[in-house]
Amino acid sequence: MVCGGFSCSKNCLCALNLLYTLVSLLLIGIAAWGIGFGLISSLRVVGVVIAVGIFLFLIALVGLIGAVKHHQVLLFFYMIILLLVFIVQFSVSCACLALNREQQGQLLEVGWNNTASARNDIQRNLNCCGFRNYNPNDTCPASCAKSNQKCSSCAPIIGEYAGEVLRFVGGIGLFFSFTEILGVWLTYRYRNQKDPRANPSAFL
């Protein structure tokens, strides 16, 4: 049977949703591992990662059930949700790749000022204090501050990695964006194909 047939479309759609399921479980596992080993203390960051993982898992589950049962309603909603996710993810990925150093610095400073727990994690792990300037009167968990040594600011250190991280995130996001649009196309195609084992007089 050619790859455009019913069975091939079904198998491809199932494989794609199994991939999404593995990615979602990986996200949830990484978040739990990070907070369990004390690498991440920000409940907000962990909550967002886990929420994204659960959302992706639910989408994959809907797509998998719809593909296995050739369920028209589930496949329709799966296709619409996947299209919306593609639009958002593609836009965010392009934005990550398009940000220049000045814009990266502005975003990092906003995030720095709004997340106290993540800020403490960064200062402790990178052994730096303050974003651009360090005030000795401020509390800093870095080892340099505890030993009364001179502490460097965190902005230059974070800036070295920010561009690489954004390019990595943008590239991964673009990859999954194209898998999502592939999923939309496969779902649309699969919905309009007739199961060869079904009743010939039945509708799809």
UniProtKB/Swiss-Prot annotation:
Keyword hit for Transmembrane helix: yes
GO biological process, one term: regulation of calcium ion transmembrane transport
Residue numbers of Phosphoserine PTMs: S143
Record: glycosylation sites: N113, N137
Residue intervals on the Cytoplasmic side: 1-19, 66-72, 189-204
Membrane-spanning intervals of the chain: 20-40, 45-65, 73-93, 168-188
Membrane topology: Multi-pass membrane protein
Segments in the Extracellular topological domain: 41-44, 94-167
Keywords from the UniProt entry: Glycoprotein, Membrane, Phosphoprotein, Transmembrane, Transmembrane helix
Entries under Pfam families matching the protein: Tetraspanin (PF00335)
Cellular component terms per the entry's GO annotation: plasma membrane
Keyword Phosphoprotein attached: yes
Coiled coil start-end: none
One Gene Ontology MF term: calcium channel regulator activity
Subcellular location: Membrane
InterPro entries from the UniProt entry: Tetraspanin/Peripherin, Tetraspanin_animals, Tetraspanin_EC2_sf
Family indicated by similarity: Belongs to the tetraspanin (TM4SF) family.
The protein's name: Tetraspanin-13
Biological source species: Rattus norvegicus (Rat)
